[in-house]
């Protein structure tokens, strides 16, 4: 296996949590384990295919755990792994920056921010 080279450490971070949806998924999982259908309901714009792909990548990188119950119909939950919890301060900082940005751009962020437990 060829060892990958990075120019700066943030490249490694973005390789794991970069993209449009991964941080959103992780923010939702900081509020507890979720089923795929719950995550889809919380992010109605994401396609099922993209959600599944992002969850698989986060699981492969050790950021989330997939908990599968052996029953019919199958029951699967996702939760942050211990390693994933190490991203909590980063996620909190991203949310705080987003609040500041929305206020700067729109004045009243409530006019553009959907109601959610994450936005309280």
Describe the residue ranges of each PLM region:
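Alpha-helical interaction segments
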Residues: 10-11, 67-69, 86-87
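Residues within the DNA-recognition helix of helix-turn-helix
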Residues: 54
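C-terminal regulatory/oligomerization modules of transcriptional regulators
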Residues: 1-5, 60, 65, 82-120
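The DNA-recognition helices of helix-turn-helix-type DNA-binding domains
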Residues: 32-33, 46, 58, 98-101
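N-terminal helix-turn-helix DNA-binding core of bacterial DNA-binding proteins
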Residues: 5-50, 71-77
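Beta-hairpin "wing" of winged helix-turn-helix
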Residues: 59-79
């Amino acid at each position: 296996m060829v060892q990958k080279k990075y120019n700066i450490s943030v490249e490694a971070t973005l390789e794991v949590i970069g993209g449009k949806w991964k941080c959103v998924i992780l923010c939702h999982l900081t509020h507890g384990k979720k089923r795929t259908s719950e995550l889809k309901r919380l992010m109605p714009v994401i396609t099922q295919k993209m959600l599944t792909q992002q969850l698989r990548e986060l699981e492969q990188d050790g950021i989330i755990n997939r908990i599968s119950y052996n029953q019919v119909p199958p029951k699967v939950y996702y939760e942050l792994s211990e390693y994933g919890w190490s991203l909590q301060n980063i996620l909190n900082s991203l949310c705080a920056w987003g609040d500041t940005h929305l206020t700067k751009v729109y004045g009243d962020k409530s006019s553009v921010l959907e109601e959610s437990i994450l936005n309280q």
